[in-house]
Amino acid sequence: MTSSNSTVPDSRSETKKFLVLLLGSIGVVYGDIGTSPLYAFRESLRPFTANGVQHEHVVGLISLMIWTLTIIVTFKYVLFLLRADNDGEGGTLSLLALLMKKTGSYMPVLFFAGLIGSALFIGDAMITPALSVMSALEGMKLVTPAFSDYVLPLSALIMVGLFAVQSKGTGAVAVFFGPITVVWFLAMAWGGLIHIGDDWTILEAVNPINALWFITHAGWAGLIVLGAVFLTVTGAEALYADLGHFGRKPISVAWFILVFPALALNYLGQGALVLSNPAAIENPFYLLYPEWALFPMIILATMATVIASQAVITGAFSLARQAVHLGFLPKLMIRFTSETNTGQIYVPAVNMVLFIGVLVLIFSFGDSESLATAYGISVTGAMVVTTLMAFQFLRSIRGKSAFTAAILLAPLFSIEAVFLAANLLKVHDGGWVPLALAGVIILVMWTWTKGSRYLREKISKNDVSLDTFITSLERSISRESRSAPVLVSGTAVFLTSVPDKAPSVLLHNLKHNHVLHEQNVILTIWTHDKPYVADTDRVEITRISKHFMRLDINFGFMDDPNVVKALPLCKKKGFKFEIMQTSFYLGRRNLIATPNTGLPRWQEDLYIALADFGVDPSAYFKLPPNRVIEIGEQVAI
């Protein structure tokens, strides 16, 4: 009886936890894709408006939208990619880390694919807030045309407020994201349902034959339209990127029981409305609703778009943290805004870049119609990259042959490649914007990675073996020779990225100060290609000699690299740190560009600028400021 009764609370607790994750996934994961009906069908129809919209065009478009959602989101992301996790974490960089760990080698093609996918996602994080919020507010034009002049300033004002609150954390308001988004999806389903009866022939769109007919008969205009059709799956990458926050099951269940049905019903309703009333092409989404519901829907849409914007901003913060830990970006200041949820972070540098980018996009494009042309490229590009990496996943992780992996992914890749080609046709109409943004981000990450690798190779030429150095030093101390340093009480910690070489800061300290602490710790901080490291594996201590020991602290690429919090774990390994008796020695390198080196001069200058932009290691690793001693050195690159 006892064991039977004890399982009931456990079962209820698990159910409650699942429902919380389910609700959260609806608000965060599906916020972006849930706002696509605001503009996707409207923009897809635009090329046909000049000659009049034909029945087969509407049915074909809606069929294409529904089956794009089915193939791309359902099959690729929900049923396949959600299973391609790195210890529970998803996303482009997480998949890249998993593949590089499995292959055990540096693969340039894989590396650049990861950079391209990440860069395109950052571009998406700029365009999504601008496009979605403007689309929502433009509905006010249906209430009163006089509101047209206020769309831009109000959109900018909302963005100012959204980015301003990032530093405070979103935990307090995030609890409302799920319920608001659930109401939004239900409202979309209702709007579609009440209009499907306007023209029952719209149900023919469920047949994929109509989608194929549209592709083969719509001609050049059809290829252009494909770029707009892909707007229906914007935000699909969030399913994979947020896998670690919510888990596969809640994300999958939310898609099948609410999100997909609501989207399909809304698109079917918009199609039936336009078939029965061609004038509704002006704004088919808002015209689904009765006049009394229009203003509430505009308010609800604005809240939904803000939530969608928050989702991509959070995703950009998370991606930046992964990029820093994996060595693709310099160390950035990362602040945790929640004591219980490590996924809630704030990255000031990324926040500022996104904020400036969003405002520039809002005032440069002026309306959602113009900005929509720029949107598809970043989304399709990121998806194509993910599919290419999925090919390597099937080979390296699942053990499939290259032929089998190609057969499995060829249909998906072909579809996405066609969509990408369609979007590339819009380069001159604004599509160059996400490409330019991605190009800049790729250049930054590539320069940092290449420069860091070159700097390590150059410094290593002058390295001194740690074991040889310590043996010589201990011998001089035991013999009390004149060259022996003065021993002082306390513990000194010397940070180094190369544990088998004597840290340059240790050498400089002995050279200039001629002192050595009674206990000296050679500390190396490792960031592993898995999301988290358990506390039991966090620290490793090795005694080298009487006065020296080696300490390795292990973090995952999603962990908070807090050294002070990790040090107490050393007590279980036989060494207790007294923080107030411990000094942390860091080397500060002053980089100087020099001619005739391994990097072009412009890349040297960019690397030095990035190094100056990065946060101090003492702040990044949360070292106590009053216990840190920095010793500088000039390094020519």
UniProtKB/Swiss-Prot annotation:
Membrane topology: Multi-pass membrane protein
Transmembrane segments: 18-38, 61-81, 107-127, 145-165, 174-194, 211-231, 255-275, 293-313, 345-365, 371-391, 402-422, 429-449
Molecular function as annotated in GO: potassium ion transmembrane transporter activity; symporter activity
Keywords from the named record: Cell inner membrane, Cell membrane, Ion transport, Membrane, Plasmid, Potassium, Potassium transport, Symport, Transmembrane, Transmembrane helix, Transport
Location of the protein in the cell: Cell inner membrane
GO cellular component: plasma membrane
InterPro entries per UniProt: K+_transporter (IPR003855), K_trans_C (IPR053952), K_trans_N (IPR053951), Kup (IPR023051)
Catalytic activity as recorded in UniProt: K(+)(in) + H(+)(in) = K(+)(out) + H(+)(out)
Record family assignment: Belongs to the HAK/KUP transporter (TC 2.A.72) family.
HAMAP family in alphabetical order: Kup
Function: Transport of potassium into the cell. Likely operates as a K(+):H(+) symporter.
Protein name: Probable potassium transport system protein Kup 2
Organism encoding this protein: Agrobacterium fabrum (strain C58 / ATCC 33970) (Agrobacterium tumefaciens (strain C58))
Organism lineage string: Bacteria, Pseudomonadati, Pseudomonadota, Alphaproteobacteria, Hyphomicrobiales
Gene it is expressed from: kup2
